């Protein structure tokens, strides 16, 4: 039975290690040298003229007649990054956005309240089109008469009243109007910003003063390269999914990684559905387009010349002569804060991905946030949540520790039985079972409670890993960022020492090999945790300390009870 217990623990350790390695292999962003950036010319929408953005009234992101046509310099809507249009800047209290007037699209979005690192206070660029990175948000009118369609002249050049716009003190909303006109049709592309919001409403107002009906499809897309997640810090377990997501009423959360786009070929991944949204997600942050109409949207992916596109196309609409029509969508570019995302769109909060144990993880997250609202320190909130979880499992843990203490108490008798029966395993097992029955010991009592608690521990791991609130959140003293490793490895070493102390309270396995494995486990875990985020290590350290206190109390109580019984018997 000692062998079974040890095998269970070692098996869990090995499986956890292999899962971490496999998960990092699948989820961690692949480094892509800048030299591999596509050399083709790209328009401000992030698309080549042959396929990505321009579609007629078929509601497709590319078309049969253009999909096979390679991008050429003669295509009317192609311009290199260097020849982009005039850039205007919009600044709110949380966002700094750059809009290219050649197409009127977002080519940079900086998150003002999220510095790159503690040492670099420069705001994090969620989107950008420089420094070897291509990540933009485009919205356009394509199809029969759409100004953005290549056959109609390609990207329109918009005019703005100012070069820069700022949300002033006391101002709750800021509107930025971009105007263009062609053949009697005037289009006003309006960006609407709100105070303390990462949501941007994008609206096209089409005023048709021509003599003919004007037809187009509204389209919105996110286009990016495969550049690595800037928030990825490396190390065991520190990766998060980097790729696309599509949400529909039928499938609220479907992840599409870059390899899926590569394997899907020219046709891409296509889904037709009303409502929903599309997004690119990374660790802590997300960009998403949310359609505002209840029409049937065609959600689709594309891969062209090293750029990955996730977008949607709405059905064709018609603006009669003398009429005005409005179409648009909502763009979100910001942190993955569950409460905020719920308000932006249904199921957008699922981008805070707690994994397959989300049913347990989500309540843990809500409790952690509730505690933080009172104490104001995420490190203290983690400690108090750990105490609360330990209290909930107090009786279950007590059962486990009581079983271990009883096993420890009868270890000398178990050793005597092994020596007495030697290689006669059948008689030895019989004698062991009689001993367990006599002493009322369940040999698996120390393992099963541990297994029952594992889902909670794993869920809390994901909660701490996915919570953007822990990013650059200080604890005390040298811990100034709970989302990265302890810079001096103090917490992992303390955790290793606590684990070593805890193993000394467990019954010593009679087999020398098992005993050596048990002694090595604290060292192995310490090495693992050296690169874990400090918040996770803090949780394990506090959990170990509480476990030691509970186990020591129960062990001493049982051992003292056994001594008292012996004195009475004598």
Curated annotation (Swiss-Prot):
Bias (Polar residues): 31-60
Family indicated by similarity: Belongs to the OXA1/ALB3/YidC family. Type 1 subfamily.
Gene Ontology molecular function: any one: membrane insertase activity
One annotated GO biological process: protein insertion into membrane
Keyword Protein biosynthesis among UniProt keywords: no
Alphabetical keyword list: Cell inner membrane, Cell membrane, Chaperone, Membrane, Protein transport, Transmembrane, Transmembrane helix, Transport
Region (Disordered): 31-79
Top-rank taxon, per record: Bacteria
Topology in membrane: Multi-pass membrane protein
Keyword check for Lipid biosynthesis: no
This protein's name: Membrane protein insertase YidC
